[in-house]
């Protein structure tokens, strides 16, 4: 694949998406850049589905000392274990991505974001969400993208919202809001603030949703240049007669159970409904389709 680069400016800051030059053995690889902060995000999926009742997705965020122009101290001169910040960043990338994969997709997927350069001004975490989304789509993995992530700060003096603020802008802000999602839906919210009103928080979320749409639109243009080949998969879906039988007999009961305000009573009610629905199936059906029931 030839090198493809998409450089754009949004909300007063310049970004770059690039693929085709690094990590060519990965299913999809995108270098995302804001200022001089650069993160390489790779996405790879197994060819065969795993025999499991869950989606085996692994997301990792790798911090490297060389990104800040440093060499690890100590005798071995080796990188240490992942920091708490790296672990939290990996989880932040995982949350919006996980819900965007096709139902019944059981192939193992690995997303690795490696910070190659940290310019001490722009933060690498939220742009990694956009990089992960672009890498997954470049790999042709069944993923309902594009998705993006934005950090919203607010200028205390003017009241203006700032998209993906620098460290300096964030320190002077009374709001630190991270939002992940698509152009028309929010998938993840993480926030900290100094007594920001509910009205201001809702305004910030609406502003974040508009910003997400802008970043998703750029990814669409980027993907058109790449034109990836969709991955051939076989979804692990429950037989239709099972879903019809469960929905017909248990939809209303489960709805009532889930709306019980008492936590322990709610858990008991949900367990009782599940046990009742399980009795709808014969022993032979339970043995054959147990993971769907």
Name these PLM-found stretches.
Residues 14, 26-110, 115-122, 183, ...:
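Glycine-rich, flexible beta-strand/loop modules in the N-terminal catalytic cores of phosphate-handling
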């Amino acid at each position: 694949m030839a090198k493809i680069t998409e450089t754009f400016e949004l909300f007063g800051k310049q970004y770059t998406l690039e693929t085709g030059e690094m990590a060519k053995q990965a299913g999809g690889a995108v270098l995302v850049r804001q200022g001089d902060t650069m993160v390489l995000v790779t996405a790879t999926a197994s060819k065969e589905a795993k025999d499991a009742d869950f989606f085996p997705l692994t997301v990792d965020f790798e911090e490297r000392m060389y990104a800040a122009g440093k060499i690890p101290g100590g005798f071995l001169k080796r990188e240490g274990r992942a920091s708490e910040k790296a672990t939290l960043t990996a989880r932040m990338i995982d949350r919006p991505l996980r819900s965007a994969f096709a139902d019944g997709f059981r192939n193992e997927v690995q997303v690795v974001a490696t910070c190659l350069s940290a310019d001490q001004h722009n933060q690498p975490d939220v742009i990694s969400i956009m990089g992960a989304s672009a890498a997954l789509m470049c790999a042709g993995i069944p993923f309902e993208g594009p998705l993006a992530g934005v950090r919203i700060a607010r200028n205390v003096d003017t009241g203006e919202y700032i998209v993906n603020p620098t460290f300096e802008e964030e320190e002077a802000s009374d709001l630190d809001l991270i939002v992940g999602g698509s152009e028309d839906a929010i998938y993840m919210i993480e926030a900290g603030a100094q007594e920001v009103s509910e009205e201001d928080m809702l305004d910030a979320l609406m502003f974040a949703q508009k910003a997400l749409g802008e970043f998703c639109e750029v990814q669409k243009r980027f993907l058109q240049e790449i034109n990836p080949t969709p991955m051939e998969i076989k979804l692990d879906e429950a037989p239709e007669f099972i879903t019809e039988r469960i929905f017909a007999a248990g939809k209303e009961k489960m709805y009532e159970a889930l709306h019980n305000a008492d936590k322990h009573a709610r858990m008991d009610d949900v367990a009782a409904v599940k046990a009742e629905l399980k009795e709808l199936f014969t022993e032979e059906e339970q043995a054959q389709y147990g993971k769907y029931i």
